[in-house]
Amino acid sequence: MLDPRHVAEHLDEVRAALALRSPAAAASLGDDFASTVSARRSNIQELERWQAERNAANEAMARLDKKSPEFAQKRDELKALSTRIKEAEQVVSELEKRMTELLSVVPNLPDPSVPVGAGEEGNVVVRAWGEKPSFSFAPKSHWDIGTALGLLDFERAAKLSGARFTVLMGAAARLERALISFMLDLHTREQGYLEVLPPFLVKDTALFGTGNLPKFAEDLFKTQKSDPERAYDLYLIPTAEVPVTNLHADEILDGASLPIAYAAYTPCFRSEAGSHGRDVRGLIRQHQFDKVELVRFSAPEDSARQHELLTSHAEEVLKRLGLHYRVSALCTGDLGFGSQKTYDLEVWLPGQGVYREISSCSNFGDFQARRAQIRYRPEPKAKPRLVHTMNGSALAVGRTVIAILEQYQQADGTVVVPEPLRAFMGCEVLRGR
């Protein structure tokens, strides 16, 4: 969430920055907010005037005889002022609550380094690694490869759960498991992350903290309450970002402990409410998928460097697996709701002839930290400050399976196993289950 005080004091400037995202983003900070800010300012001025009158009345009473009529009169005036002050404080509190509610659906401000653009076409490719694999045959899509080898069963998945689910069979299931282990080992043993295995169900407060609620409720799977005494709702996590970021919600961290780096494997669950008719074939867009997530917490002055470091850690997975990819800096119009800067890692899929996102590495600045109240103390007696948070997939496991099937396919329909995974898999080539 944006800083309410900063927005109130620089409303036109903030709207201009939001307009770089889209007209809708600028409109999200509407006239309601401006009028609420104005009402708060007026009430604070009135409150301060009454507080000054109360202080003056207290000073006057101190000079009066407690048995005099004047003392009794001042005492009555003081009681009336105290009542007014209490009422005014309540009004200010309600107005500040309203400001927070209005800001809860306003996206983050783009970092000045983000390219300006209206949508995906405005993204800028900043680097690429490796070469597109060449084939002596027409490369197939992963769904054709997986089906022919008996590794991907879409029909039985539909029988079990409906559309956008897949059953991985035999070697495909082992490949998924091998990738999870390979990614976690790389991140924890070589890159310094602490492995976390969080709950896959979270409270609505956690989803508010990361910015998923209230704006993106339709993309979440909400459970039904079996216990009427439970005071909160539980949701299936859309990403490990949610529970891992909220590990430190409502905490004040020791500045000496920063940066903090976590790696977590979880299944993820998304309703894909806004993607009807898109990517209906294969593993690209599923209701349930596996992901290894990196989350970092840093001091503001180290934020940009930590974001670049996290991105390089996600890239290293692709490099080790020998998968050709490129890195795109998202433009202002394509940024996610809470992000101030994002790099997308896009892997080449020769069977489809396209690059597809396999990781989004985002810096949120203090946007999530303000919502979740994650702070740190730079020095032992210093005033707490908001941390900066950043995260990225490293990687989306199902999409990594897709990339391996398509980039490592052979003319006979088999698939070469990338060298780093062979010890996990116990084979060099996928020939079937």
From Swiss-Prot:
It is found in: Cytoplasm. Pathway: Aminoacyl-tRNA biosynthesis; selenocysteinyl-tRNA(Sec) biosynthesis; L-seryl-tRNA(Sec) from L-serine and tRNA(Sec): step 1/1. InterPro entries: aa-tRNA-synt_IIb, aa-tRNA-synth_II, aa-tRNA-synth_II/BPL/LPL, Ser-tRNA-ligase_type_1, Ser-tRNA-synth_1_N, SerRS_1_N_sf, SerRS_core, tRNA-bd_arm. GO terms for cellular component: cytoplasm. Keywords: Aminoacyl-tRNA synthetase, ATP-binding, Cytoplasm, Ligase, Nucleotide-binding, Protein biosynthesis. One of its GO terms (molecular function) is serine-tRNA ligase activity. ATP binds at residues 270-272, 357-360. The keyword Cytoplasm applies. Belongs to the class-II aminoacyl-tRNA synthetase family. Type-1 seryl-tRNA synthetase subfamily. Consists of two distinct domains, a catalytic core and a N-terminal extension that is involved in tRNA binding. This is Serine--tRNA ligase. It comes from Sorangium cellulosum (strain So ce56). The gene is serS.
